[in-house]
Curated annotation (Swiss-Prot):
Transmembrane segments: none annotated. It comes from Gallus gallus (Chicken). The lineage of its organism: Eukaryota, Metazoa, Chordata, Craniata, Vertebrata. Disulfide bonds join C82-C88. Causes a rapid but short-lived drop in the level of calcium and phosphate in blood by promoting the incorporation of those ions in the bones. It is found in: Secreted. This is Calcitonin. Coiled coil: none annotated. The gene is CALCA. Residues 1-25 form the signal peptide. Its main location: secreted. Residues 26-79, 118-138 form a propeptide. One of its GO terms (molecular function) is hormone activity. The modification Proline amide is found at P113.
Amino acid sequence: MVMLKISSFLAVYALVVCQMDSFQAAPVRPGLESITDRVTLSDYEARRLLNALVKDFIQMTAEELEQASEGNSLDRPISKRCASLSTCVLGKLSQELHKLQTYPRTDVGAGTPGKKRNVLNDLDHERYANYGETLGNN
């Protein structure tokens, strides 16, 4: 992108240098006279070239502005808009917390619904399981 801008400015500069000879202006440097003698453009060609360069430059700047406006949209996550500011870090943490709260639950792990075993109750139940049988036999 930068190379296109530089090349367009160089082309405009070359156009101006070529036109300096046609307007009988003094050259910037004496060494440029031989270059301007070899390269001559008619007024029509020079205007067309200048119009094309201006249109390209306007189109490039419009595309850059469009990309910049897309880059600052609210649809992008906060983490991509800024990285190290404290408000951005807090925003990123709140996004992660929200993701964890809205994330669908799975049926594995310690806090899942279903049959829960209590080890102490199981030991007491096994200890007194035969108590009723011994009373019935006496």
